[in-house]
Structures are given as C-alpha cells and as structure tokens.
Amino acid sequence: MRYLAIDYGDKHTGLAICDPAETIASPLTVIEGQKDLIKKIADIAKNENVEAIVIGLPLNMDDSQGFQAKLVFQFADRLKAHLQIPIHFQDERLSTFAAEEKLAAPEFTRKKKKKKRLDAIAAAEILEAFLEQKNAP
C-alpha cells in the first residue's frame, strides 16, 4: 500500500511517501503556507496513487493532546472532504529532533537547504514509525 505522510504546520507542511512494498519512506516536498494546502495535498495524493494518509499527531510527553493536536484534527477533517481514502494518525513526538539529527550530515551544510528539507524529513520519520508499528510481528 502506498502511504503519504504529512507533518502539518502553520507555515510549512512536510510530505513524505513510501514505496508500494512499504519498506522505504522518502521525503517528498515541503508546501509553504496555507493557501491551497488541501488542494495541493489532494493533487499529490492522486498523482502519486496514494492509498492512505498518515498525519503526524503532536502529543505532549504525557500522551495528552494539546492545542496543536486539535489543529491537526481540524486539518484532517478538511482533508477528508477532498480525499476518499483512509487517514491514520501517528505520534510525531521527537520526529523533528530525529530529522534535525539527519540534517547534521555533511551533505546538508547550507542552513537554508536544511530548513527547506526539515519538514519533509520529519514527515518521513513519521511514516517510518507508522510502517514499523504496522508491520511489526
């Protein structure tokens, strides 16, 4: 199954996608701002033959849902109106930290390049966690 992961944010929304065998999660793109965000994601999902969506859910360290989690659920409701495919949620705690660790690699030396890719890499981290959980024995 082909999944599209979303690291939702007010200013930047990162997207990642997996291969049909569900073995590799790859950063796809970062969408800037909110203008036409839902339409852009719906178009990407259709063009990439996505069968389900995974949205990062920002939980607090005590597992409670804060204000940002409510915004993610509202975003998911808007997305459901445009896509007739399942939407899953995945705990995204520490996904940005893991993405920042990956960006410390030498190939990401320019600060602007790092910032541009961070949200897409965080989305890939979210998708990797989802796939590991889903495919665990």
What kind of region is each of these model predictions?
Residues 2-3, 10-11, 16-137:
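Phosphate- and other anionic-substrate recognition elements at nucleic-acid/protein interfaces
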